[in-house]
Amino acid sequence: SELSFNYPNFQSVEDITFQGGASPRNETLQLTPTDSNGIPIRQRAGHAVYSQPFQLRDTSFYTTFTFVIRTTSNSPADGFAIFIAPPDFPVKRYGGYLGLFEPNTATNTSANKVVAVEFDTWVNTEWKEPRYRHIGIDVNSIVSVRVTRWQDKDVFSRSIATAHVGYDGISKILTAFVTYPDGGNYVLSHVVDLAEIFPGDVRIGFSGATGQYETQYIHSWSFSSTSTNLLRD
């Protein structure tokens, strides 16, 4: 199904649903809460989701967003993700589960229905993941199917980074491209049939989680989906 929206900033948060510790702040989406002194609150998770559902059958989409990670130490945790899930998807466990998974089922692909591109600032030893900060593609599991190393100079830069995520409904390729103004470029892709995972309605949004010493902000966001049916004659 076709859907498009564009937020050059979040002066208006019409059609954004906030759950858990997420809230609108200074024309951004703040994914995890801070106290009255601006200090990140530990062990919290939040979602900011576009309210209107859409479907992925015979659909391609493209979304781009800008983000900043504000760190208050050299060991921040845990990161954030852009994710697709059914409309009733709740905020899940904080910490390394990124608000998207529960501890007892986090690595069980048959127990989850969520696909995400994660920006992981903390190495969790509880499950198999690289021993460095990374950007990854997650398919129904906290263990990423694709990862690329996220350079510390970018993680700690406080720069506004730009991420592009695209999905081709015909080739079933999900691609993420992330770029920093004075830093690295990151690209990763994975073949996954999203319409098979999600036969019904889905929503797209952001999930953030702490840890500590970190706050995640989304500064802008646009999205458009198109039907691939026209090409299938």
UniProtKB/Swiss-Prot annotation:
* Location(s) in or outside the cell: Secreted
List the SUPFAM superfamilies: Concanavalin A-like lectins/glucanases (SSF49899)
The annotated thermal profile of this protein reads: Heat stable. Retains hemagglutinating activity after incubation at 100 degrees Celsius for 30 minutes.
The GO molecular function terms of this record are: carbohydrate binding; metal ion binding
The primary site where this protein sits is secreted
Q: Please give the residues the UniProt entry marks as glycosylated.
A: 26, 108
Q: Name one GO cellular component term.
A: extracellular region
pH dependence per the entry: Optimum pH is 6 for hemagglutinating activity.
Q: Which residues are involved in binding Ca(2+)?
A: 120, 122, 124, 129
Q: Which residues bind Mn(2+)?
A: 118, 120, 129, 134
Keywords from UniProt, A to Z, are:
Calcium, Glycoprotein, Hemagglutinin, Lectin, Manganese, Metal-binding, Secreted
PANTHER family in the cross-refs: CONCANAVALIN A-LIKE LECTIN FAMILY PROTEIN, LEGUME LECTIN DOMAIN-CONTAINING PROTEIN
Q: What else is known?
A: Hemagglutinating activity is independent of divalent metal ions.
**Oligomeric and partner information:** Monomer.
What family is it from? Belongs to the leguminous lectin family.
What does this protein do, in the record's words?
Has metal-independent hemagglutinating activity towards erythrocytes from rabbit and human. Hemagglutinating activity is inhibited by glycoproteins fetuin, asialo-fetuin, thyroglobulin and azocasein but not by free carbohydrates. Inhibits ADP- and epinephrin-induced but not collagen-, fibrinogen, thrombin- or arachidonic acid-induced platelet aggregation in vitro. Has anticoagulant activity in vitro.
Q: What is this protein called?
A: Lectin
Q: Which organism is it from?
A: Bauhinia forficata (Brazilian orchid-tree)
